[in-house]
Amino acid sequence: MLSAFISSLRTVDLRRKILFTLGILVLYRVSAALPSPGVNYRHVQQCIQEATAGEAGEIYSLINLFSGGALLKLTVGVMPYITASIIVQLLTVVIPRFEELRKEGQAGQAKMTQYTRYLAIALAVLQATSIVALAANGGLLQGCQEDIISDQSIFSLVVIVLVMTGGAALVMWMGELITERGIGNGMSLLIFVGIAARIPAEGKQILDSRGGVIFAAVCLAALVIIVGVVFVEQGQRRIPVQYAKRMVGRRMYGGTSTYLPLKVNQAGVIPVIFASSLIYIPHLITQLVRSGSGGVGKSWWDKFVGTYLSDPADPVYINIYFGLIIFFTYFYVSVTFNPDERADEMKKFGGFIPGIRPGRPTADYLRYVLSRITLPGSIYLGAIAVLPNLFLQIGNGGEVQNLPFGGTAVLIMIGVGLDTVKQIESQLMQRNYEGFLK
């Protein structure tokens, strides 16, 4: 592996991509440390500490997890882009025009990316406006009595909203730069470094509050989860494919045997990111409703969220989170892998699965195999995401868990890490170097 890493640095083009990616990630972490103008940073920190100890502490920790501590600086981070991506992906099933764009290849994908950008900016404006409005009237963080925004004039509030929206656009631009000119998926890598940046502080918190024995147990559990995740992520069902010989001009092509790899976890970490992003929406709605009513009384929605969606050990919370992961796993697999299209491509180039007729029977067979491996893959994702949260919640005696050591964070970090390593490996293999993974 060391020799492969040295080879990647010796290759000029690959070295440029790796250094470019690292440079953007460093720039992202530096920009993430800058608070929004007009915001009392110390008061925000104090309010965050009070809020994470309350009933919605899990959600505040979750938002900070994905944004790399953006909530501490009163910024929006990557959340608008994630939400926009979810909506655009859902629209490909609902709106025929989006389905046509998805089938148009690179041109259609570029158009959908453009729609995602526009929607992300609109959501960033909406989210920034909501955060500033809630922070101005004291309804952003539960139990917070501090003055977060000192100057509450219209001009000052508009400037804060514009700066927060510009920050979200900058984060989106950084992610797309990494995807286009660097290595790996840009937005996933930004989430990755956001989680990694919080590990030392959260580890120290566990060590100080729970002692060395609990800290060692948590590290051991995280190590076991990492080994299990890597094992499952590398698992795949290989469907043999043969290509018939055919004459093109004066040359004979085909006659080779290969395989079609179908991963056990075909969807990757996307379902976990989508489900974790959606789980905080009920709390945002609750805050808006509570702010609109002046904090007087509690609606049925407020009571439902406070009772069932605030405690990660609650059975309703676990079932909803687990169900969202399974839903997004099936949904994302159906969007990214189309058995009919794959069967048509194989038939076009003279490929066939031994024992299966080309065309419709091949598509039905691929659909059957995919459905059989997607179910255990979705259950695996849900179990890894839910069980460590429950165990750590019980071990803390009811305190809010440290999310960077939970299943959601481990899944995201391992999934993004493996995907990035595989991209580097493919670049090395194209240049006749030995890869990382053997």
UniProtKB/Swiss-Prot annotation:
<dbReference type="GO" id="GO:0043952">
    <property type="term" value="P:protein transport by the Sec complex"/>
</dbReference>
<feature type="transmembrane region" description="Helical">
    <location>
        <begin position="177"/>
        <end position="197"/>
    </location>
</feature>
<feature type="transmembrane region" description="Helical">
    <location>
        <begin position="212"/>
        <end position="232"/>
    </location>
</feature>
<dbReference type="Pfam" id="PF00344">
    <property type="entry name" value="SecY"/>
</dbReference>
<feature type="transmembrane region" description="Helical">
    <location>
        <begin position="18"/>
        <end position="38"/>
    </location>
</feature>
<keyword id="KW-0653">Protein transport</keyword>
<dbReference type="InterPro" id="IPR002208">
    <property type="entry name" value="SecY/SEC61-alpha"/>
</dbReference>
<comment type="subunit">
    <text>Component of the Sec protein translocase complex. Heterotrimer consisting of SecY, SecE and SecG subunits. The heterotrimers can form oligomers, although 1 heterotrimer is thought to be able to translocate proteins. Interacts with the ribosome. Interacts with SecDF, and other proteins may be involved. Interacts with SecA.</text>
</comment>
<feature type="transmembrane region" description="Helical">
    <location>
        <begin position="269"/>
        <end position="289"/>
    </location>
</feature>
<keyword id="KW-0811">Translocation</keyword>
<feature type="transmembrane region" description="Helical">
    <location>
        <begin position="121"/>
        <end position="141"/>
    </location>
</feature>
<keyword id="KW-0472">Membrane</keyword>
<keyword id="KW-1133">Transmembrane helix</keyword>
<dbReference type="InterPro" id="IPR026593">
    <property type="entry name" value="SecY"/>
</dbReference>
<protein>
    <recommendedName>
        <fullName>Protein translocase subunit SecY</fullName>
    </recommendedName>
</protein>
<dbReference type="GO" id="GO:0006605">
    <property type="term" value="P:protein targeting"/>
</dbReference>
<keyword id="KW-0813">Transport</keyword>
<dbReference type="InterPro" id="IPR030659">
    <property type="entry name" value="SecY_CS"/>
</dbReference>
<keyword id="KW-1003">Cell membrane</keyword>
<comment type="similarity">
    <text>Belongs to the SecY/SEC61-alpha family.</text>
</comment>
<feature type="transmembrane region" description="Helical">
    <location>
        <begin position="315"/>
        <end position="335"/>
    </location>
</feature>
<feature type="transmembrane region" description="Helical">
    <location>
        <begin position="398"/>
        <end position="418"/>
    </location>
</feature>
<comment type="function">
    <text>The central subunit of the protein translocation channel SecYEG. Consists of two halves formed by TMs 1-5 and 6-10. These two domains form a lateral gate at the front which open onto the bilayer between TMs 2 and 7, and are clamped together by SecE at the back. The channel is closed by both a pore ring composed of hydrophobic SecY resides and a short helix (helix 2A) on the extracellular side of the membrane which forms a plug. The plug probably moves laterally to allow the channel to open. The ring and the pore may move independently.</text>
</comment>
<dbReference type="InterPro" id="IPR023201">
    <property type="entry name" value="SecY_dom_sf"/>
</dbReference>
<dbReference type="GO" id="GO:0065002">
    <property type="term" value="P:intracellular protein transmembrane transport"/>
</dbReference>
<feature type="transmembrane region" description="Helical">
    <location>
        <begin position="375"/>
        <end position="395"/>
    </location>
</feature>
<feature type="transmembrane region" description="Helical">
    <location>
        <begin position="154"/>
        <end position="174"/>
    </location>
</feature>
<feature type="transmembrane region" description="Helical">
    <location>
        <begin position="76"/>
        <end position="96"/>
    </location>
</feature>
<dbReference type="GO" id="GO:0005886">
    <property type="term" value="C:plasma membrane"/>
</dbReference>
<keyword id="KW-0812">Transmembrane</keyword>
